[in-house]
């Protein structure tokens, strides 16, 4: 038997109840995905003005599908500031909330 598809709701109808923001004590930064480099790596334009190469950890690889233009939270490496780990991906309603509150420019 085939699986029955359920109709998806329009993104604008979703209500945002809680949005995860970057935590300064963990050195987290907002970033926009510039390009996909392959092999679980992405090019990131961070909000602190640095272009970093991001790595998608194996625990989030299958659960978090990332495309160009997505807004994510990254943690820069302590050893190399030009590299970072992607730890969170925002949905469209969450991105709109971040823009309204002034987190994104």
UniProtKB/Swiss-Prot annotation:
InterPro entries: NA-bd_OB-fold (IPR012340), RNA-binding_domain_S1_IF1 (IPR006196), TIF_eIF-1A (IPR001253), TIF_eIF-1A_CS (IPR018104). SMART domains: eIF1a. Keywords: Initiation factor, Protein biosynthesis. Residues 17-91 form the S1-like domain. GO terms for molecular function: RNA binding; translation initiation factor activity. Gene3D superfamilies: Nucleic acid-binding proteins. PANTHER family: EIF-1A (PTHR21668). This is Translation initiation factor 1A 2. The lineage of its organism: Archaea, Methanobacteriati, Methanobacteriota, Stenosarchaea group, Methanomicrobia.
């Amino acid at each position: 038997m085939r699986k029955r598809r359920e109709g998806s709701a329009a993104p604008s109808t979703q209500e945002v109840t809680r949005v995860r923001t970057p935590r300064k004590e963990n050195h987290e930064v907002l970033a926009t995905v510039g390009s996909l480099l392959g092999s679980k790596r992405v090019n990131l334009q961070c909000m602190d003005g640095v272009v970093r190469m991001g790595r998608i950890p194996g625990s989030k690889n299958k659960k978090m599908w990332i495309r160009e233009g997505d807004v994510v939270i990254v943690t820069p490496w302590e050893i190399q500031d030009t590299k970072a780990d992607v730890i969170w991906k925002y949905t469209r309603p969450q991105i709109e909330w971040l823009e309204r509150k002034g987190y994104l420019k």
